[in-house]
């Protein structure tokens, strides 16, 4: 007897012996005979329309790859494993969407997996503060991530023991003479934020408030002097005070000081002639001795040139006289070729060129 339709192997052969044992162990509701035949016909029509005519018992269909389960996902206890009849399993696998929607945002390392429709923007990680204050990473969700379209989760602030605020930093002493510590006039931010507030595309971000700037160097010293006067202490040494530099005009007009004096210091004439009717004074004793020879007539310096018996009271006079015998003229005029044996004669000659 010829059959009008091709005979396909039974779908019961797709099930492995292990699945059969599990099906016998777990109780299930037996479907009605009419409903099962109708479901099988629908599945068969769907397979034929998809062009799976060569499907056999040896090559069961491979299910599409499933995405890895999100982090921190645990199956519900007490639920039986999803085993059913082979026909229903095959239909469910063919009619199941390719990818299951994610269950919710999950944290993988430094990235946040969020469901579609929510944008995730990565930002550079912030620098953690000290042991006190609110941790930046806890106050704004996971560190280095910014979730758009959703309000940021505010973390808990880490404080010191018994909820006390951190102690203010001590300022260094103004001078070695007095170790007076003056507290700052206003709150100061010990850790400036590494990044400024960026533009927000979702809701308004948390507002950042910065304290007033620290007082300048001049204001700090003025406050220190006022506080010392109020406490009855001596003001700090003037060497610690800072003064503004002078104007550029004063710097240009100021002339550098010379290392040596511009005029020689006038020496006191302490050597005085003791002869009557002579009150000459000299700064050097040698000069006074030469002057006394004029009163006594002593001439110790003699010219040794042959045939010359001149005598002189001073050595420089003998030197000039000796140049007459030798003809030596050390004083040369730089404007002409004339030379002189005495410096005073050269000075008189230079006046003629002027």
From Swiss-Prot:
9aaTAD, short sequence motif: residues: 42-50
Post-translational modification comment from the UniProt entry: Ubiquitinated. Polyubiquitination involves WWP1 and leads to proteasomal degradation of this protein.
GO cellular component entries: chromatin; nucleus
Lineage top rank: taxon: Eukaryota
Tissue: Predominant expression in the lungs and spleen.
Domain notes: The 9aaTAD motif is a transactivation domain present in a large number of yeast and animal transcription factors.
Protein name: Krueppel-like factor 2
């Amino acid at each position: 007897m010829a059959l009008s339709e091709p005979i396909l192997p039974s779908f019961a052969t797709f099930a492995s012996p292990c699945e059969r044992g599990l099906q016998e162990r777990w109780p299930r509701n037996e479907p009605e005979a009419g409903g099962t035949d109708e479901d099988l016909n629908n599945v068969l029509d769907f397979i034929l329309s998809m062009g799976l005519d060569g499907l056999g018992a040896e090559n069961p269909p491979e299910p599409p790859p499933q995405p890895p389960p999100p982090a921190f996902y645990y199956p519900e206890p007490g639920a039986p494993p999803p085993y059913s009849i082979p026909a229903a399993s095959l239909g469910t696998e063919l009619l199941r969407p390719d990818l299951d929607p994610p269950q919710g945002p999950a944290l993988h390392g430094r990235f946040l997996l969020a469901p579609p429709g929510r944008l995730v923007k990565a930002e550079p990680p912030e620098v953690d503060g000290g042991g006190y204050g609110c941790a930046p990473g806890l106050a704004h969700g996971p560190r280095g991530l910014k979730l758009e379209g959703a309000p940021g989760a505010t973390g808990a602030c880490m404080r010191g023991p018994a909820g006390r605020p951190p102690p203010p930093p001590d300022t260094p002493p103004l001078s070695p003479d007095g170790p007076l510590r003056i507290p700052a006039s206003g709150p100061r931010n010990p850790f400036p934020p590494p990044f400024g507030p960026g533009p927000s595309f979702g809701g308004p971000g948390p507002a950042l408030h910065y304290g007033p700037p620290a007082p300048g160097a001049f204001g700090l010293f003025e406050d220190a002097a006022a506080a010392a006067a109020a406490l009855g202490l001596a003001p700090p040494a003037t060497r610690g005070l800072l003064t503004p530099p002078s104007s550029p005009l004063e710097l240009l007009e100021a002339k550098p000081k010379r290392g040596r004096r511009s005029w020689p210091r006038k020496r006191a004439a302490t050597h005085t002639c003791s002869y009557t009717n002579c009150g000459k004074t000299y700064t050097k004793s040698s000069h006074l001795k030469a002057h006394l020879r004029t009163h006594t007539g002593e001439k110790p310096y003699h010219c040794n040139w042959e045939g010359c018996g001149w005598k002189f009271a001073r050595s420089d006079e003998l030197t000039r006289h000796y140049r007459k015998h030798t003809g030596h003229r050390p004083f040369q005029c730089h404007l002409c070729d004339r030379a002189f044996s005495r410096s005073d004669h050269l000075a008189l000659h230079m006046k003629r060129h002027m």
